[in-house]
A protein has these predicted regions:
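Bacterial N-terminal signal peptides that target proteins for export
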Residues: 1-11
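Bacterial N-terminal signal peptides
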Residues: 9-20
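Signal peptide processing junction and immediate N-terminal pro/mature segment
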Residues: 21-31
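Active-site-proximal N-terminal segment of extracellular/periplasmic enzymes that hydrolyze or transfer
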Residues: 29-76
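Short, structured active-site-proximal loop/turn typified by the sulfatase FGly-forming signature C/S-X-P-X-R
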Residues: 56-106, 230-232
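His/Asp/Glu-rich, glycine-adjacent segments
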Residues: 100-101, 105-345, 474, 486
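Active-site neighborhoods of enzymes that stabilize oxyanions during catalysis
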Residues: 179-181, 186-200, 213-218, 227, ...
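Metal-dependent active-site segment of extracytoplasmic phospho-/sulfohydrolases and closely related
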Residues: 371-414
């Protein structure tokens, strides 16, 4: 019997709960190696993306008989766990699968840059690698631009495109999704839906670096698979097959289920959602989307593959991420989809996302999302109990990341495009170099920039510009109250690390090619 140690990691102030399902006598002070006499053979890992420790505490206080309350009271709760830094779906997901932070894994974001690779699409690798984008996200799909089902004419002012729900057209030819339930038949190895021409190119082989080979350390799936046990995972992009780990050939996750969340949201009857958006910008749609992954997990707990058609045995490690809470924290949208007698569907009215203004109390939309997650966890636990797996299964509930700020009145939105353009223009004026200084980066609730000139002087230039220039922020107005704009100092930033300081912050050598030059 292989002894396995379950490690839960979560964001600052997030919930991390480890529960041996049948251990009714479990206490939070139980020794780490004490499983109450039960031999754990299966671990169900659940990431409730976006959930905070305060959300968990609030929900349990309001719903003391809920499944979340039962699991917390029967398990060990870690209330001061920390996420990766930076914190987002990735590197947060990679942290859960490896136990590593970006220093160890080499993954800083799903959209980043590497100074030691050739740009995507390079076929002739001569001379030193100039650096290039390292993007492992939905643009990597083979069908990245399916025309809008509601507005398919490019001349329509509302025309837009989405990646295909099945990534590469394996279920829906041309990405024409008229029956989203068919997604359950998605391949357990969806790598064929990835467009390798979008990946950075390895200078030593002049070949694209596959997502799993970009990781610098192995993953839990590699360990378990190598030990002869079955593995499964469900997530929002096929590119998250990166969790297979380096050198795996993408084969250490036996059953990966990754419907593309950035595809156009379609109601169960094949009608596009009236909000005309993707699965991540309408919480009613997000719940439908999460439901496919929940069904995949239940099928796997029942001993089948994610489609429920092949009997393969219950995986030793399996799980999924929930998106409903994360979306309900940040996107004003309907919360429910109701089926009508004639087979059509009706969405509820749009509700405000996040928390009640001035508080960290979940508003109705977020409360509904927490209810949804709780109900799906109850389904999973019921399945575990019904299948006789309770004495041999542990559940880990955690989060890849949180969402900030919780109090919506603290939210200040600052467009980054004008700032980047101004930095590049100032650099040209100073040096005469007409090439953009900032060539890549991600600016979310943080700022990270990669520079075309990797010197301390260039990094200091960006830092000094950001610190000495104000920016205009749009204040929270989702509730209909026009609070106007506000001039914020230091480009809206609180702390800036540049060059050697950025390397020291992440704990890597200055010569490391992956960390952001300015953070």
């Amino acid at each position: 019997m292989h002894k396995l140690r379950a490690i839960a990691a979560a964001a600052i102030g997030l919930a991390a709960v480890v529960i041996p399902v049948a251990a009714g006598s479990a206490h939070s002070n139980r020794a780490a190696n004490d499983h109450g006499g039960h031999q754990i053979k299966h671990v169900l890992l659940i990431s409730v993306d976006g959930i905070h420790q305060s959300d968990l505490e609030w929900y349990i206080s309001q719903h003391p008989g809920s499944e979340l309350a039962k699991l917390v009271h029967k398990g060990a709760e870690f209330s001061n766990a920390r996420t990766s830094d930076p914190s987002d779906s990735d590197p947060g997901g990679t942290a859960l699968m490896t136990g590593g932070d970006p220093r160890a894994t080499g993954v800083y974001y799903d959209v980043e840059y590497n100074h030691d690779v050739f740009p995507p699409g390079t076929t002739t690798c001569t001379g030193p690698a100039p650096g290039g984008n390292a993007i492992y996200d939905s643009p990597d799909d083979k069908l990245p631009a399916v025309p809008d089902f509601l507005h398919p004419n490019p001349s329509d002012p509302n025309f837009q495109t989405f990646p295909s729900f099945d990534e590469g057209g394996s279920i829906f030819p041309g990405g024409n999704d008229t029956n989203p339930g068919l997604i359950m038949g998605l391949s357990p190895h969806p790598q064929s839906g990835l467009n390798t021409a979008t990946f950075p190119v390895d200078p030593s082989t002049c070949k694209p670096i596959m997502p799993w080979d970009y990781l610098k350390v192995n993953t839990i799936f590699q360990v378990i698979h190598s030990a002869g046990m079955r593995t499964a995972w469900s997530d929002k992009h096929a590119v998250y097959t990166s969790f297979n780990g380096p050198g795996s050939g993408g084969a250490s996750i036996d059953d990966f289920f990754g419907p593309e969340i950035d595809s156009q949201a379609v109601e169960p009857n094949g009608t596009p959602y009236p909000t005309d958006t993707d699965w991540a910008h309408d919480d009613a749609a997000t719940k439908q989307y999460d439901g496919y992954k929940v069904q995949a997990v239940i099928n796997e707990l029942n001993g089948f593959d994610h489609s429920g058609t092949q009997q393969v045995g219950t995986p030793a490690v399996l799980g999924m991420n929930f998106q409903a809470v994360s979306v309900a924290e940040k996107v004003d949208s309907p919360s429910t989809l109701t089926k009508n007698a004639d087979g059509t569907y009706t969405e509820s009215p749009t509700e405000l996302a996040g928390y009640l203004p001035g508080t960290t109390t979940p508003g109705p939309l977020l409360s509904s999302a927490l209810d949804y997650v709780n109900a799906q966890l109850e389904r999973m636990v019921d399945t575990i109990q019904h299948d006789g797996l309770a004495k041999s299964t542990a559940i880990i509930i955690t989060a890849k990341h949180g969402q900030s700020p919780q109090n919506p009145l603290l939210l200040k939105r600052i467009p980054d495009g004008p700032i980047i353009s101004a930095v590049n223009a100032a650099w040209t004026a100073k040096t005469g170099d007409t090439n953009p200084l900032i060539v890549a980066g991600t600016d979310d609730d943080l700022w990270q920039s990669y520079l075309s000139v990797k010197t301390q002087d260039a990094a200091n230039f960006v830092k000094n510009y950001l610190w000495t220039h104000p920016a205009t922020a749009q204040l929270y107005n989702n509730d209909g109250v026009d609070r106007g704009t506000e001039s914020v100092a230091h480009s809206g930033l609180a702390q800036i690390y540049a060059g050697h300081d950025a390397a020291a912050f992440f704990g890597v050598p200055y010569s490391d090619p992956r960390y952001p030059d300015v953070f």
